[in-house]
Each structure stands twice: as structure tokens, then as C-alpha cells.
From Swiss-Prot:
GO terms for biological process: acetate metabolic process; acetyl-CoA biosynthetic process. InterPro entries: Ac/propionate_kinase (IPR004372), Aliphatic_acid_kin_short-chain (IPR000890), Aliphatic_acid_kinase_CS (IPR023865), ATPase_NBD (IPR043129). ATP binds at residues 16, 210-214, 284-286, 332-336. Homodimer. It is found in: Cytoplasm. It comes from Corynebacterium jeikeium (strain K411). CDD domains: ASKHA_NBD_AcK_PK. Pfam families: Acetate_kinase. This is Acetate kinase. GO terms for cellular component: cytoplasm. Substrate binds at residue 93. It catalyses: acetate + ATP = acetyl phosphate + ADP.
């Protein structure tokens, strides 16, 4: 009998989940996928998708617990309820593990209390993650629950990369350092590269580029992260869909003094109203492309700023690593935006990087990892589809089976 893992990602107004076979091929569809969204709004939405059927519910959803319980009930009606499956674990994505959690952990009451202590580090994400964990534990009491942290992969950062140049006692008191995010994705795709190159993992230097609505880059040496663009929070680094990425911190002081902006207003500005959306009015790359084709100058400038930031970090990481064997594009934009890949890698022949336009463009129908660099390119460029849910399922299974 196939053993399954329930993987949950609980957000502020939604819950996404999948039921997966942790031993399945990376390109296999999940056994069950579901979403609970618009929690707390007048009209909610729950959708459950199996290999053969789909069910939807548009009634109001008062809370996360109500939504998850209703979703499990719908799964039961489809014959794939949690009680019908041999669930070996429930894996929970948790955005911030701070310095406390540097690897997946089996969840108990003490772990939940420790997670609550980390809320100041991720006030936008961790409360919803914790809510999802508590609701799932209440509904699935006899299933081992495992937390997998976005930050864990970056616990290997050297001290000179992890620390900020601010007063040490303040940094220590408030746990201020570079934690990094998207770690599950960076770890997953980077683990595929040694086989693509035919080299031992410990000999591979690579730059991984997770480009979605949120975006981050990582420098990885011998399978361990040595630098990454996101920092204390997911706001730092690359230009993103709605986040500014790196800016001069003095901008915030200027807005506070000259414009009377509050901390909460600045938070909203930089996290939700900046990036591509702030500059061009849209954060979807397909819409941005349409605006550019229509001659929108703001959209073109937003795109140029995005590419400039991306190339700046790629160049920086090449120097930090002392040369690279591979550059990897992943996530929604990284996997699908042909022009972003082309422009990010343009005119780098002097650094041993050369894109094959045909390979870059003619990727429709190709499943799995693929090379988009030329045969003569000494630095290989790959597109590697990420699968964070499968990675979480495998890590949760491994830990649960050790108990």
C-alpha cells in the first residue's frame, strides 16, 4: 500500500495542501491537491482536485480551522479523506525558524511555543503557519507533524555573510542577522545539479535563482549555502513582484521625516506596494510583458531595474564563489520567462557563460531539468523545476520514520 504525506502551507487568508507519495517521481502529479482561500471574506472558496475528480465549495469560511475541517470532509466524500489514506506524516512549511531551528523538527507543544517566540522575526508569515499547524494537529491527532523551515538551508552561512554591520549588542538582543528564505527550493534544485554536470556534489559551485513573485538568489559551494539575497526578512535582495528588494535604509527615515510615514505604512509600502507593482502597476510578468509591448515606459523601466538587480547579484556571487560550474533558474518566472533568462545571461561570454537561444526558447513540452547553455559554455546554465512540496514530504517522512 502506498504511503502518503500531507503537505500544508498555511497563509494569512488561505491554506494550500497536497497529498503526495514521497517516493514518487518529481514530475508526478500529487495524489490530492487542495486550496482553501478567501478565509474570513463574504465568499470563500475550497477546491479539492484528485487524479479523477474535482469538488468545489464557495460558502463563507469563518476561520482556518473551519476551512481545513471542511476541506477534509470534501476529501472524504471523494474517497481520499485523511482517514482513508496511510498518512505517514503531515509536513508543514514554516517560513522562519530563526537560529532555533536549523533542520526539520517533529512538532510538539514545546516546539509550538518556540515558534510563537519567533513571531517578531516573521510577523506576516509565522502566525498563519502556526495556526495551520495547530488546526491540523487537532484534526489529525495520530499523525506525526513535522515543521520544515524556509530558513534552515541557510544555517550554514559563514558568520561574515550572516552578520550585519550594526551595533553587536543590539543585533544579539533582537536576533538580527541574515537568515535567508526559499531554502527548501534552493536546496532541492541545487541537489539536482551535480548529476546534471556529472560531478561529485562537493566539487560543484553554483548560483541558484528562485524567481517567482518572491525572488531570491543563493551562492552554494559543495552543497552548502555560503550567501543569499534575502536577509532578516524576505524583503531584502532582488526586486520582486510587490517587494522592493534592497534599498537604501535612509529612504525610510526620509519618508518618516518628510512625509510623516509610520512604521506600518512603510512596511506596507515596501512589502506590498513596491517592486514591479510599485513601478509598473502590475506584478504578473505576463501583464508586464504586454505593457512593454504596448510601449509603456514605466513597465520597461521596472523590467530593466529587475534585470539589473539580478545581474548584480549573479556577478557578486561569481566572485564570492571564485568561479561557478552552474547557474540555475527555478520557480514560476525562472522556469517560464524566456526573456528574463536571456537578458540575465546576456553578453557574459567573457565569463564563460553563453545561452543557446534555441534551447532557451524551445522548451515547450520538456519535462524536468534542462540545459539552456551552449555546448561551448564553460559555465552551464540550467532550468530546474522546483518542487517544494515533494521536498517537504520527503523530509517529513524521513524524520517521522526515525521516531
Amino acid at each position: 500500500m502506498t504511503k502518503y504525506v500531507l503537505v500544508l502551507n498555511s497563509g494569512s487568508s488561505s491554506i494550500k495542501f497536497q497529498v503526495l507519495d514521497p517516493e514518487a517521481n518529481a514530475t508526478a502529479d500529487p495524489f490530492v491537491s487542495g486550496i482553501v482561500e478567501k478565509i474570513g471574506e463574504k465568499k470563500g472558496h475550497i477546491q479539492i482536485q484528485t487524479e479523477t475528480s474535482k469538488m468545489e465549495d464557495n460558502r463563507p469560511i469563518l476561520s482556518h480551522s473551519v476551512g481545513l475541517e471542511r476541506a477534509f470532509g470534501m476529501m472524504t466524500l471523494l474517497g481520499v479523506g485523511p482517514q482513508d489514506l496511510d498518512l505517514v506524516a503531515a509536513g508543514h512549511r514554516v517560513v522562519h525558524g530563526g537560529a532555533t531551528f536549523t533542520e526539520p523538527v517533529l512538532i510538539d507543544d514545546e516546539v509550538i511555543e518556540q515558534l510563537k517566540e519567533l513571531i517578531p522575526l516573521a510577523p506576516l508569515h509565522n502566525p498563519a503557519n502556526i495556526d495551520g499547524i495547530e488546526n491540523a494537529r487537532a484534526l489529525l491527532e495520530h499523525v506525526p507533524h513535522v515543521a520544515v523551515f524556509d530558513t534552515a538551508f541557510f544555517s550554514t552561512l559563514p558568520e561574515h555573510a550572516a552578520n550585519y554591520a550594526i551595533k553587536k549588542d543590539i543585533a544579539d538582543e533582537y536576533n538580527i542577522r541574515r537568515y535567508g528564505f526559499h531554502g527548501t527550493s534552493h536546496e532541492y534544485v541545487s541537489s539536482k545539479v551535480p548529476d546534471l554536470l556529472g560531478k561529485p556534489a562537493e566539487e560543484v559551485n553554483q548560483i541558484t535563482l528562485h524567481l517567482g513573485n518572491g525572488a531570491s538568489a543563493a551562492a552554494i559551494r559543495g552543497g552548502e549555502a555560503v550567501d543569499t539575497t534575502m536577509g532578516l526578512t524576505p524583503l531584502a535582495g532582488l526586486v520582486m513582484g510587490t517587494r522592493s528588494g534592497d534599498i537604501d535604509p535612509g529612504i525610510i527615515f526620509h519618508l518618516a521625516r518628510s512625509g510623516g510615514m509610520t512604521v506600518d505604512q512603510a512596511d506596507k509600502l515596501l512589502n506590498r506596494e513596491s517592486g514591479l507593482k510599485g513601478m509598473a502597476g502590475v506584478n504578473d510578468f505576463r501583464e508586464l510583458k504586454t505593457l512593454i509591448e504596448d510601449g509603456d515606459e514605466n513597465a520597461q523601466l521596472a523590467y530593466d531595474v529587475y534585470i539589473h538587480a539580478l545581474r548584480r547579484f549573479i556577478g557578486s556571487y561569481m566572485l564570492i564563489l571564485g568561479g561557478v560550474d552552474a547557474i540555475v533558474f527555478t520557480a514560476g518566472v525562472g522556469e517560464n520567462a524566456v526573456q528574463v533568462r536571456r537578458d540575465a545571461m546576456a553578453d557574459l561570454q567573457n565569463f564563460g557563460i553563453e545561452i543557446d537561444d534555441a534551447r532557451n526558447e524551445n522548451s515547450e513540452g520538456i519535462v524536468g531539468a534542462r540545459e539552456i547553455s551552449t555546448d561551448d559554455s564553460t559555465v552551464k546554465v540550467f532550468v530546474v523545476p522546483t518542487n517544494e512540496e515533494l521536498a517537504i514530504a520527503r523530509q517529513a517522512t524521513e524524520l517521522a520514520e526515525q521516531q
